[in-house]
Amino acid sequence: MSTKLILSFSLCLMVLSCSAQLLPWQKGQRSRPHHGHQQFQHQCDIQRLTASEPSRRVRSEAGVTEIWDHDTPEFRCAGFVAVRVVIQPGGLLLPSYSNAPYITFVEQGRGVQGVVVPGCPETFQSGSEFEYPRSQRDQRSRQSESGESSRGDQRSRQSESEESSRGDQRSRQSESEEFSRGDQHQKIFRIRDGDVIPSPAGVVQWTHNNGDNDLISITLYDANSFQNQLDENVRNFFLAGQSKQSREDRRSQRQTREEGSDRQSRESQDDEALLEANILSGFEDEILQEIFRNVDQETISKLRGENDQRGFIVQARDLKLRVPEEYEEELQRERGDRKRGGSGRSNGLEQAFCNLKFRQNVNRPSRADVFNPRAGRINTVDSNNLPILEFIQLSAQHVVLYKNAILGPRWNLNAHSALYVTRGEGRVQVVGDEGRSVFDDNVQRGQILVVPQGFAVVLKAGREGLEWVELKNDDNAITSPIAGKTSVLRAIPVEVLANSYDISTKEAFRLKNGRQEVEVFRPFQSRDEKERERFSIV
């Protein structure tokens, strides 16, 4: 009886432990700390918005990292940090993790993305086998023989030495078997332009450009997220590499910051936190040698990034990755689900997180959520079609407007948004809570415009059209249009509109039903333009 009680108690503890590990990934309303979004609300008294481009560029061996000035009122209000990364062909963005969740949009190019989630199994295996290094095997064999010859004069420790030798032999045999099986690792997948790639805080990701053109991506960090347990600054922790600046240069910059203005000091400090150093560089050689057995001093030095001036985007050499096609990924995921369902066993974390997709493309017209053949389309990625977004409370929307087409006016009910223009140019107007314009200007490719929650925005494309991606800090961000078939005015009775605007019921009816389109509107056309269009179609 006592044995059964002990077993039951142990099982309960194990279940509680697994649940505790999953809590950090659950939605933020239940675990948002006191220093989250509420702390920075006083910074949202915005009088003017700006469409901005990157203010700082950090060069590496095989690419460039561009950082927006996130010390502006709108960036601090939203808690956003924006970074654009350009990886040259053959370049590798080194593995790193962040203290804040983020969402990445691939603007241009193709490549390979790797994701490492703590606690998840290594389900990928390379197709090629490795040959166990002959030199190491021969050297260890000679060391073993030398040890055996010397044990004749040390009979008192013979049994301990034999046991150690057997342990070394088993270790060498196990290592040799691992080499013969090939390399095992966590998931990797192909990425291309239009892909949205999310990442929770603390999850390691890396990117390789295996294409022929530059791989360009824009990343938005949510510094105010419940997953960020530090302050409002975003920090990247790299597992390899080193900044191109020497430690002496960084010390000199710190001293300059102390003597400079507060604003410049904050900007430099924030940028340095994003791209400063390899986290392994702070550990002593002796500790690393004890942890990573069977590696020489040169490898330890390279782990710490000593004398490494390549930066955090390096030129990869002989990097050949066996990447599954998309249909193979889906098949593998389905097989895993059936296997777990049939066995009835699961470790909880695997079902909840390890098998979630880390990619969704928003540049496919066939999957548009809103489509107007004469105006444009909207593709949305949220937790409904990419469930991992529920864990990080971020989402994305890709909008394509044709020539002179209009989107809006509309506002975000539950999120701030950052509009990043990917093609074309157009005019944007934003109106704040005081009923006056806080932005009225043209935007073009490469600019970001932050629109706070509740601010109404309208966009009109230019002659070449306008495309942009909106990155939002809610996994199910909701917009409310003011005009159109699904608008707020359409849902209000005619009599209420007539009294609200002091107009006749006839005018209120026209106001309410003037547009039958949904969010994306074709441009106004005169009678002559309509006739010319009809004639050209015929």
From Swiss-Prot:
The keyword Disulfide bond applies. InterPro entries: 11S_seedstore_pln, Cupin_1, RmlC-like_jellyroll, RmlC_Cupin_sf, Seed_Storage-Functional. SUPFAM superfamilies: RmlC-like cupins. SMART domains: Cupin_1. Residues 125-194, 241-272, 326-346 are annotated as: Disordered. Gene3D superfamilies: Jelly Rolls. Hexamer; each subunit is composed of an acidic and a basic chain derived from a single precursor and linked by a disulfide bond. Belongs to the 11S seed storage protein (globulins) family. This is 13S globulin seed storage protein 3. It comes from Fagopyrum esculentum (Common buckwheat). The gene is FAGAG1.
